[in-house]
């Protein structure tokens, strides 16, 4: 087979951002059939009183609707994806070392986006209505702990999951 079939869990942006600072999110574009057609990794996405926006330069901000689908890097790949990453890593490394060796990051969504553009992969987006809980900042921890406790009390997680 010449193409790969992958899966991604998509969340609503508004259910994934913190009140305590910026986050990185893969902003997704899908077609009418639930397939990913593009993904742009935005490394400075923030809530503000008027909604949610991102910036690339710290000066110019772009609003993003709260219901925009985003990737939280929950992917379903086949083993061939590792070969694709291995083939693409040298070019990334050359560029990262030249441009920003301290902060260079090989984003999985970039490789996926390249594969989609090359017509080598199809990604089905499985949408989740749930809120994403994560600790990006220390101030996020109390709400995450409370949410995990509530979901345990509701039976969504077994008591003693971490024992």
What are these regions (language model features)?
Residues 1-75, 79:
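Conserved core of the sugar-phosphate nucleotidyltransferase
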